[in-house]
């Protein structure tokens, strides 16, 4: 259905729209709805989460395939490009990690970051992540004959990189929960962290550099740009002066510190 929607949209607006993106932050729905259970339907079900994530991935790949076909037929603007935008979060752990802590980092990175990077840059999913999910955790991903050919079509022209916060993890207390579903990690509280208390998000400007360099190293042929980065603050009227100007020096500092790290990449 989504692939058909994309095809119709491109046929209607292909002569006007030059830059297309299949999804913005496709990781959010499977994580928030089914992994963490904080959005409707408020379920904590890793199997459901990974299969929703897998189906969104296929939808992305089919959308890219439709774009390529229409472009080859001359139905899109000259120089038209297609990409994906995702919120990436570089994972970190303790200063002296155990092998179990490093495994939590690997799978957190694999499911949240590398899953999407491998598809958009290389046209496949990370095999080590699939092996862990299906062989070690015994969670079935509903893969069908022909899916690999669909995934191979998922490579994009460029990537949008949203960055707000890192992910800090350590080994979970147990490998499986009371329902027999895998526990990927548990949060690690870095003693030196600086927080945006209004969002509950850590402010870590170096993370935008670390992940940008990861993209350059692992996907050297994939152009990317910073598509989102900023600081959300609730109730900013309390920082408003007598002239009606919000004195948001905290936001200026946030943007400045991130730009300094971007300049080093």
What does each model-found stretch correspond to?
Residues 1-265:
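Active-site region of glycoside hydrolase catalytic domains
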């Amino acid at each position: 259905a989504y692939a058909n929607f994309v095809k119709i949209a491109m046929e209607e607006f292909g002569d006007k729209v030059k830059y297309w993106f299949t999804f913005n932050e496709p990781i959010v729905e499977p994580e928030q709805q089914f992994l963490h259970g904080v959005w409707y339907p408020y379920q904590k079900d890793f199997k459901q989460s990974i299969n929703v994530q897998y189906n969104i991935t296929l939808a992305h790949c089919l959308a890219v395939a439709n774009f390529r076909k229409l472009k080859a037929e001359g139905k899109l603007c000259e120089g038209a490009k297609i990409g994906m935008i995702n919120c990436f979060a570089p994972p970190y752990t303790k200063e002296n990690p155990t092998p179990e802590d490093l495994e939590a980092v690997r799978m957190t990175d694999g499911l949240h970051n590398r899953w999407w990077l491998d598809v958009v840059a290389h046209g496949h999913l990370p095999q080590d992540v699939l092996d862990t999910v299906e062989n070690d955790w015994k969670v079935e991903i509903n893969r069908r004959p022909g899916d690999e050919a669909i995934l191979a079509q998922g490579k994009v022209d460029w990537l949008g990189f949203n960055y707000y916060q890192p992910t800090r993890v350590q080994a979970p207390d147990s490998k499986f929960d009371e329902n027999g579903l895998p526990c990927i990690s548990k949060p690690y509280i870095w003693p030196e962290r600086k927080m945006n208390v209004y969002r509950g998000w850590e402010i870590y400007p170096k993370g935008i550099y670390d992940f940008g360099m990861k993209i350059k190293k692992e996907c050297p042929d994939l152009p990317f740009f910073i598509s989102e980065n900023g600081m959300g603050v609730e109730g900013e009227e309390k920082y408003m002066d007598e002239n009606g100007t919000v004195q948001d020096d905290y936001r200026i500092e946030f943007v400045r510190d991130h730009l300094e790290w971007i300049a080093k990449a």
